[in-house]
Amino acid sequence: MATPVDTEYYDLLGISTDATAVDIKKAYRKLAVKYHPDKNPDDPQGASEKFQKISEAYQVLGDEKLRSQYDQFGKEKAVPEQGFTDAYDFFTNLFGGAPFREWVGELSFVKEMFREEDSAVEQGQMNDKQQLLLESSEPTPTIKQQFNDRKKNAQIREREALAKREQEMIEDRRQRIKEVTENLEKRLDDWIAKATTEEGLNALREKYTQEANTLRIESFGVEILHAIGEVYTQKGRTVLKSSKFGIGGFWSRMKEKGKIARATWDTVSAAMDAKLSIDQMQKLEDKGEDQASAEERAKLELDITGKILRASWCGARYDIQGVLREACSNLLKKRVPTELRLKRAHALLEIGTIFSNVEADPDDPNRIFENLILENKKKRKKGSEAKPPKAT
């Protein structure tokens, strides 16, 4: 293999020039999480620039044709036909991406993540201007007054921007629930219309099994299918038990509330765990001491990546299931005719069961992020089991 004329992209991803496609993807995904601006609040602009360079490197090296062009002629001759995609696309596609859009809509936490990034950069620029005003000359009473006025106006604008973002979030969620509800209604209506015979029912089961097998190969595909399946089966069983036993529906609703509470706790604790590890790593770097070997530091970085991913996935799952519960509830309201409501519940239970039974391929080399989370869970479980009991 000839030596590439330019190695900048390889250096950015920290890989050798003979790295395999899997090695390239692993390196990119690890760095994309590490340098995402949302995970670097102290320097969102610098992290954003680094993130974009990493993304650009992956888009070239991850494409066999572009990589060949890059190796032979350099990066000027290795540009995608449609241009480079931005960093937003990475996190949009991290949890399912376009193939799942019809099922769960666009994840709100991704949109909010980038809204906050833009706000942080804008606020940082405003603070720099205010600081320049103070440092430009002797801070006379007039300059101090100008500084205080600007600071006050900036705070007002910040509150207004926050209120605007919150309103946008509410409207985005309302629209997303509406679209997911409409898509689900079409699917349930189709199921009800075709499931009138044993042959039709078997054909539907085969159709959704094939669709699930297609979706499972997407990033976090199996996990998202399980999240969808859990909500569908829970909602379907609640309606069917309420119709048959009455009290059974009550216990199903209580069980659902318990799962929501657990999911909330998982999301919060995962975020706290990730932040603690990031803070520990930052303290180590701030000291500037070689307290850990390269191997130990690499393990720590990998552990942090796993924790960040776990926190991100917990947030994504919470987001997905919250929207799906609303969509299912819209289609199972008591004002819906009883017969139709029961048929929809049966259809939800069928589809949910198919999705819940999907299994991951343990040898799939593309399940890099998912396996990192799995390893992180194993470490947490092992750590909790290793803790000695408290003295009484």
UniProtKB/Swiss-Prot annotation:
One family name in Pfam for this protein: DnaJ
Gene Ontology molecular function terms on file: Hsp70 protein binding
GO BP field: protein import into peroxisome matrix; protein insertion into mitochondrial outer membrane
Location of the J domain: 7-76
CDD domains in alphabetical order: DnaJ (cd06257)
GO CC list: cell division site; cell tip; cytosol; mitochondrion
Alphabetical list of InterPro entries matching this protein: DnaJ_domain, DnaJ_domain_CS, DnaJ_X, J_dom_sf, Peroxisomal_DnaJ
Keywords linked to the UniProt accession: Chaperone, Phosphoprotein
Positions carrying Phosphoserine: S108
UniProt-recorded name of the protein: Uncharacterized J domain-containing protein C4H3.01
